[in-house]
């Protein structure tokens, strides 16, 4: 499936990952076994944490979100909610997503969520994510899904 296309490679990546055999569980995080992103008006995506696998299963349109390459439900080990300004680009409803200026967000993994801050050094640079102690976050090894959440819809995201 698509997840296999982007498996860990021997190259410099955009993220910092935990060392082999190390699991990241945010100490002071809020419970995030279910994360609903009601800010998306069409597909209403959400994630459900599977404690057995340590992964989040993704859903949308009221059902499992399935990878068309292998017919398996999409899963991820880490979710990053990146809060961004998203003004209308034109009269057709297209959004001009600001993925450059930096902002706040959430890092979600292993049933927990913590507040983060994100920034970029340049328009084409790598996005860096920092915890409340200004340390760049380390992700659990595996798949990471980044969701852009419009600044004016942050309150529509729920955690259970």
Give the predicted meaning of each segment.
Residues 4-160:
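A surface/extracellular/periplasmic glyco- and lipid-processing/surface-interacting theme
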Residues 1:
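Extracellular calcium-associated, cysteine-rich motifs in secreted modular proteins
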């Amino acid at each position: 499936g698509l997840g296999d296309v982007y498996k860990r490679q021997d190259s410099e990546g955009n993220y910092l990952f935990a060392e082999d055999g190390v699991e990241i569980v945010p100490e002071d995080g809020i419970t995030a076994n279910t994360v609903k992103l009601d800010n998306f008006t069409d597909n209403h995506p959400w994630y459900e944490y599977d404690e057995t696998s340590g992964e989040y299963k993704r859903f949308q349109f009221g059902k499992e979100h399935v990878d068309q390459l292998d017919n398996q439900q999409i899963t991820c080990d880490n979710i990053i909610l990146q809060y961004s300004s998203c003004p209308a680009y034109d009269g057709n409803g297209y959004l001009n997503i600001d993925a450059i200026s930096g902002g706040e967000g959430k890092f979600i993994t292993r049933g927990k969520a913590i507040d983060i801050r994100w920034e970029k050094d340049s328009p084409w640079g790598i996005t860096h994510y920092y915890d409340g102690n200004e340390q760049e976050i380390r992700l659990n090894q595996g798949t990471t899904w980044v969701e852009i959440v419009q600044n004016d819809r942050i309150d529509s995201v729920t955690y259970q």
